[in-house]
Amino acid sequence: MTAPRTPRKAFGRLSLPERTYLADALRTETVGGVLLLVAAIAALVWANIPALHDSYESVSHFHFGPAALGLNLSVAHWAADGLLAIFFFVAGIELKRELVAGDLKDPKAAALPVVAALCGMVVPAVVYTVTSTAGGGSLSGWAVPTATDIAFALAVLAVIGTSLPSALRAFLLTLAVVDDLFAILIIAVFFTETLNFAALGGAVVGLAVFWLLLRKGVRGWYVYVPLGLVIWALMYNSGVHATIAGVAMGLMLRCHRREGEDHSPGEHIEHLVRPLSAGLAVPLFALFSAGVAITGGALADVFTKPETLGVVLGLVVGKTLGIFGGTWLTSRFTRASLSDDLQWADVFAVATLAGIGFTVSLLIGELAFEDDAAMTSEVKAAVLTGSLIAAALATVLLKIRNAKYRGMVAEEERDDDLSGVPDIYEEDDPAYHLRVAAIYEKKAAEHRRIAEEMESARLAEVAGGAGDEGDGPA
């Protein structure tokens, strides 16, 4: 008789290597997210103080770069096309690692974040389309509310002091990685109007050389950085968005470990480049992209114009319903059950948190309304408003369960045997139980000694008291 299959757990315990990688990656992203938040606030202040507004516009639109190479760009343009290529390079490495060593390696495990991310992009696009069509607005911004900003989401978690269990954090990170993949495809397919095939061919040749050098084991930043810059410049001049070059190079790195390796080349390079991406590239992009004029009338327009209302509803309603619905449907069809410590309310809260769309949403907003400066600013204001509402809702929902999360995180990190490895990963190791037994035996012996000393002191005190009574008057 065949034994019944144990239902697969959704949001189950991560392996120790996955947990370690996740902790390192999210630590950097959290710091970067806080810097991103600071940069966004600085941009809004800079752009909205009358005495400083003109200087913000002057700096943002200041052009520099070699015109002969078609690279005489504004500061804001350099931030969007140049610095964000670093962000997408890291996204490419993350995606490659997830495909070869992470949740996306196993088709069954991959189904949950992939379907959730896909639904989390389709539903916001539908919400925007319906809202904009009903109000007679433009459909050009349908892709704006489809993106999730993992750094901003983690910054919110850091600010409100919530410690999500590692399984939910891993889901959020994997969701963001898949989300970035779809965003890359959207940018490449829908925002490429004209192609320069000579430049595109040159970029493809450059990528082939990049791949060949990696295959041959050639090392040295002085080889890859100049080559990467050439590939980026050719991709920019081809008409394809230049950030695609970063993704392509990231995907080419080897992310599986060979025997004797502590880290794969992809993991090593990601460890070096991620702080540059999270700490410099993305905050600078935010500084020169989030500086929109905020007035009472502008905020009112966000909720009255169909395009901007579509963006807000897409982020707040579409993202939440799409991700939550996709997760629930996938769990139903794959017969996966939630981890015992989690509830569907936790998944809903994380889905709400994923409604924070900032970096990529701002980028897509600039591309979608490139020829309409006024609408670009209004859509940016809508992205900021929608992200703020999503962050506020997520804060309330997560705070309700914060005590439970703290307990789960404490249990995940408990290390009674002081081995440096959390106990939950050693429960099947006899040596772990022997170490714990030795620790408790040592503690028991110490407590017995203390008890014996206290008892001896008490008996001595009693005996002394009896002697004093015998020496008294008859």
Swiss-Prot record:
Q: Which GO terms describe its biological process?
A: regulation of pH
Q: Which organism is it from?
A: Streptomyces coelicolor (strain ATCC BAA-471 / A3(2) / M145)
> What topology does the record note for this protein and the membrane?
Multi-pass membrane protein
Q: GO: which molecular function terms?
A: sodium:proton antiporter activity
Q: Which reaction does it catalyse?
A: Na(+)(in) + 2 H(+)(out) = Na(+)(out) + 2 H(+)(in)
Q: Which family does it belong to?
A: Belongs to the NhaA Na(+)/H(+) (TC 2.A.33) antiporter family.
For this UniProt entry, which segments traverse the membrane? Answer: 31-51, 73-93, 110-130, 141-161, 171-191, 194-214, 220-240, 280-300, 309-329, 347-367, 378-398
Q: What's this protein's function?
A: Na(+)/H(+) antiporter that extrudes sodium in exchange for external protons.
Q: Where in the cell is it found?
A: Cell membrane
- State if Ion transport is listed as a keyword: yes
The protein's matches in Pfam families, at most eight in alphabetical order, are given as: Na_H_antiport_1 (PF06965)
* The organism's place on the tree of life at top rank: Bacteria
Identification of the protein by name = Na(+)/H(+) antiporter NhaA 3
